[in-house]
Regions:
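C-terminal and inter-domain tail/linker signature
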Residues: 1-121
Length: 121
């Protein structure tokens, strides 16, 4: 399975289907997190995702790109309160598993206009 396929499958199972039963297949035991609100390791991710699910997020994947062992996911996230966030998740893949994660999040962007007139992404 390619790194892009791994990420797409991970997002479908975890973010869309809210299923953590195969998390060991996707995430390294020593998963390293750089997001300011999420702790390291699988346990940190599990604590975060269970809290995140309470917002009933709807994920619309916009693009998945990769360069060797780095995969970027661009998506739109609509929360139950109507807020729309645009997110870029960046993963480092090692030995077929998510090893490290960074993210960039633009919060509540649907009504924001850029100076250029272009969309945020």
């Amino acid at each position: 399975m390619s790194n892009k396929e791994l990420i797409k499958k991970f997002y479908n199972e975890v973010f869309t289907n809210r299923d953590l039963s195969n998390l060991d297949d996707y995430m390294a035991d020593d998963y390293r997190q750089h997001s300011p609100e999420v702790a390291d390791k699988k346990s940190g991710f599990i604590a975060f995702i269970k809290q995140f699910w309470q917002f009933n997020p709807k994920i619309e994947m916009l693009a998945v790109t990769s360069d060797e062992n780095i995969v970027q996911v661009f998506f739109k996230c609509t929360l139950k309160n109507g807020h729309v966030n645009k997110v870029c998740d960046i993963y480092r893949i090692a030995s077929g598993k998510l090893q490290e994660h960074w993210d960039v999040i633009e919060h509540n962007v649907e009504d924001k206009k850029t100076v250029s007139g272009n969309s945020i992404f």
